[in-house]
């Protein structure tokens, strides 16, 4: 896909000239990143703007532009540096390009400082404290996740939470697929572990957000994820967020952004045989069911956005949750599948960008790490270590003010994709029309 984007840039430059070609590059690449984030093979992990997740003081203006703004900054600076190097190698005047390069680097950083100060001043007027307990049980997904007994694991979860619960705790969060065995959603109350969670909720006076592997049965085939049963009914499996509230019906939200090749087989609607090559991740094999629309939970004390693992790398998905009223971002994940690689570190770091884009506190419960608490300015307030059992007490705030990015989403990416198509069509016309003369 990246090669196709550069091939498009090369084609435009060839037929419109160097000047227009280089001017088109930001539109080409931004448009590519936007398109790549919105098809069935989407993988926005590699978007250029993600690199600033470790330099959050430089990109506080992501609350306006999102990651696409960072991508645009990188492309513009690199274009200036390329032109500077080209002129220097040709012994041409470089003073103007050097000045422009310096301005392109400095202005966004200065703007970031001003934006951060402005936000920190405004947040003082909105203080609704919301205490959260984050549990990191550290269950080895390769050896314990699907073999440990549900009662033993439930007891462990509750004991860990007990160590940090206070009378002010509003929410307790357990990681993705903490309930790793599949069960029908309308039968959760019949499970032998159910009383343990209900008793804990009543004792704590706090709601529980927990990851679960769930199922639903349908009379008719609902989607490509529906599996036919011997009796002619259909079952769908889900990677779900489950909200357990005192004396109220349990609520479920299914993961919407599924991992390609593990939870979702791209375009299997058209090529059903592809379902047979799905990777076995220890649970249901093949495409999982997913939500039709973006949803949030209403807890007893405020609105939260349940973000399951891979969903946290999708800026527009999280922005839509905030548009729907989410006041706190809650990431649940099981990063143990990565092993001790840069993957889990990057995944944690990207969450800092979601906090800045939407100006929300973000709390993260990861099975094996890293769990953590991130402020609306992307600052890591506290974090756990990798592959260690831990519990964090998070003193956060519920925030409701919407940012430009929360309101309009990736407007830069959408606009760039549109302009890219126009430029590309125009360059095709320049190639074709001369041949007809």
Describe the role of every protein-language-model region:
Residues 1-119, 339-340, 351-354, 366-374, ...:
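Membrane-embedded alpha-helical bundles of multi-pass enzymes
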Residues 11, 87, 159-163, 320:
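A generic secondary-structure signal
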Residues 16, 37-68, 195, 228-315:
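Active-site catalytic loop in hydrolytic enzyme cores
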Residues 26, 171, 178-179, 187-216, ...:
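CN hydrolase (nitrilase-like) catalytic-core segments centered on the catalytic cysteine
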Residues 108-111, 147-148, 330:
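Class I S-adenosylmethionine
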Residues 116-264, 293-300, 306, 310:
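Soluble catalytic regions of membrane-associated enzymes that act on cell-envelope
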Residues 231-255, 370-395:
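Amphipathic beta-strand/beta-sheet edge segments enriched in Tyr/Trp
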